[in-house]
Amino acid sequence: MSSSNDHVLVPMSQRNKNGLPGMSSRGARTLAEGDVLSFHHITYRVKVKSGFLVRKTAEKEILSDINGIMKPGLNAILGPTGGGKSSLLDVLAARKDPRGLSGDVLINGAPQPANFKCSSGYVVQDDVVMGTLTVRENLQFSAALRLPKAMKTHEKNERINTIIKELGLDKVADSKVGTQFTRGISGGERKRTSIGMELITDPSILFLDEPTTGLDSSTANAVLLLLKRMSKQGRTIIFSIHQPRYSIFKLFDSLTLLASGKLMFHGPAQKALEYFASAGYHCEPYNNPADFFLDVINGDSSAVMLNRGEQDHEANKTEEPSKREKPIIENLAEFYINSTIYGETKAELDQLPVAQKKKGSSAFREPVYVTSFCHQLRWIARRSFKNLLGNPQASVAQLIVTVILGLIIGALYFGLKNDPTGMQNRAGVFFFLTTNQCFTSVSAVELFVVEKKLFIHEYISGYYRVSSYFFGKLVSDLLPMRFLPSVIYTCILYFMLGLKRTVEAFFIMMFTLIMVAYTASSMALAIAAGQSVVSVATLLMTISFVFMMLFSGLLVNLRTIGPWLSWLQYFSIPRYGFTALQHNEFLGQEFCPGLNVTMNSTCVNSYTICTGNDYLINQGIDLSPWGLWRNHVALACMIIIFLTIAYLKLLFLKKYS
């Protein structure tokens, strides 16, 4: 759904002491009231492994002694690909792995507070909003988890409505954002929705990672105009950007140029051309300054070639060969350190209290939450249910397939008889049900993989705890997607097949299928948690279930397997379900009707099994009640183990880049 809203100039309203936009009685905040972010001697190194057989670890410097200050206004970080602009942005936002990081980031001269990641806003490059929800529902989710519970619902709704109006999202407020399967709002509206998610907490500092990526030039210009008006209300807006056009560049208040992790320029954006001219690089008429800066850094600009041509003869006479051969980046970095602009910045940074800078930052601690575990659990489960209903191709389709498959299997095995062929058919349908429950549970691998980026962003931003997210997703997935198919299978097949006609046996079969589905899904979660690619987790699951089928008890009699391999049967999920279903159905059944005891003994002696008990004994299944329930106990233990592994993998997942 496209909209002209991308190109509408939206006036930003004033803000009061409570930070509520559009409700001010005191007037707008001035620039002087905004937060000032300064960074001192920022150096960031990472360890890079190389080699195949012999792994060598080398240290790579991403940022090298970066100093600067970001004041209220538009602060742009510009540079070539791989220059370190996104790394610097993440460091300033306290979203970089603190290992390998040195230096200080201060807010108004003081270390970043422990809740800095929660109190500031961060808009990621790829908009991580729930596509199956509307714009308003996404904002409601952010408000419900990031605003204090003491704040009344009507106050939260008032803030949401104000932000929607501020961002020009009135016409699409109740439209779905859109997914890869369903069309939704436009790219510019999606970007503004992401910004609105962060404005819920009314942050004084807002970070954006390449906010114009994926947008056309007109929409990108509209987004930057919106950010410009927001900055005039006293916000410090810091963002990385790649090759902005001139209409966007002239909006910048401050410009930071990075290349190879070194600072090329940091100061007022409008002084950048004059600065480069003083370095000997003159921008051609009608050339975009942003493109010119990148061309100079990359050594591709005609200005660079012209400068070299004019000065080459003089340089050959006066400079040493080593200095003449220095890369442009090294020369520009050295020129900046000796420049007047750097001296002014350094003097301003030195005015900050030294004692405070040495305290260090606590911003890398765990997020500070303003809502309880139960409150977070309820909202996560609610959003997940809505997301499930918003993807009918995944939820409704699975239920329809379950009904159709159940009817087909019921027709194939319809009216099982109490004879030797009936025993074989019963074993066959039980084997199919347990293995089918396992393979259909492979879809659970998507539960954490698809939303990995969304989870990491929301967790770091202080939306919820890992435990709240984990159990909320379990409630929303295991109940409808694993419970209902098991109930449907049992209700359809039990009566079409003519299985044991007791209420107890009916519910035991249903419970067994549910336990198998839950165990297989838990295994899928344990394998997939922390993965980035669904196909890898799916492949591992499929291979695992194929091996489990071999030890389920139908394809080979488990008593005939050698002791060096027989222990693998205890790791087979289908085996426990298959054994429980057989015990539930065959115990006490007669399959040679009309035969007396003598003839029955003859049948047994000639290897014809006529009773369910004999069949169970032949399969090595204990006839006692414990022979049934120990399978469910084993499945329950496996569920606990797999879910614990999945939770720990989420808990210790690398959440910082």
From Swiss-Prot:
Induction line: Down-regulated upon ischemia-reperfusion.
The EC number(s) this enzyme carries: 7.6.2.2
A cellular component term, taken from the record's GO annotations: mitochondrial membrane
Single Gene Ontology MF annotation: riboflavin transmembrane transporter activity
Domain ABC transmembrane type-2: 389-653
PTM (free text): N-glycosylated in brain capillary, kidney and small intestine but not in heart. N-glycosylated. Glycosylation-deficient ABCG2 is normally expressed and functional.
Keyword line: ATP-binding, Cell membrane, Disulfide bond, Glycoprotein, Lipid transport, Membrane, Mitochondrion, Nucleotide-binding, Phosphoprotein, Translocase, Transmembrane, Transmembrane helix, Transport
Membrane-spanning parts: 396-416, 429-449, 478-498, 507-527, 536-556, 633-653
Major subcellular location class: membrane
Disulfide-bond pairs as recorded: C592-C610
Residues annotated as glycosylated: N596, N600
Membrane is among the record's keywords: yes
BP GO annotations: biotin transport; cellular detoxification; cellular response to dexamethasone stimulus; cellular response to estradiol stimulus; embryonic process involved in female pregnancy; export across plasma membrane; lipid transport; negative regulation of intestinal absorption
Broad EC category: translocase
Residue ranges occupied by any ABC transporter domain in the UniProt entry: 48-285
Binding sites annotated in the UniProt record for ATP: 79-86, 183-189, 210, 242
Claim: Metal-binding is one of the keywords in the record: no
Chain ranges on the Extracellular side, renumbered to this chain: 417-428, 499-506, 557-632
Residues in the Cytoplasmic compartment per record: 1-395, 450-477, 528-535, 654-657
Family: Belongs to the ABC transporter superfamily. ABCG family. Eye pigment precursor importer (TC 3.A.1.204) subfamily.
Main function: Broad substrate specificity ATP-dependent transporter of the ATP-binding cassette (ABC) family that actively extrudes a wide variety of physiological compounds, dietary toxins and xenobiotics from cells. Involved in porphyrin homeostasis, mediating the export of protoporphyrin IX (PPIX) from both mitochondria to cytosol and cytosol to extracellular space, it also functions in the cellular export of heme. Also mediates the efflux of sphingosine-1-P from cells. Acts as a urate exporter functioning in both renal and extrarenal urate excretion.
Domain notes: The extracellular loop 3 (ECL3) is involved in binding porphyrins and transfer them to other carriers, probably albumin.
Protein name (database record): Broad substrate specificity ATP-binding cassette transporter ABCG2
Species annotation: Rattus norvegicus
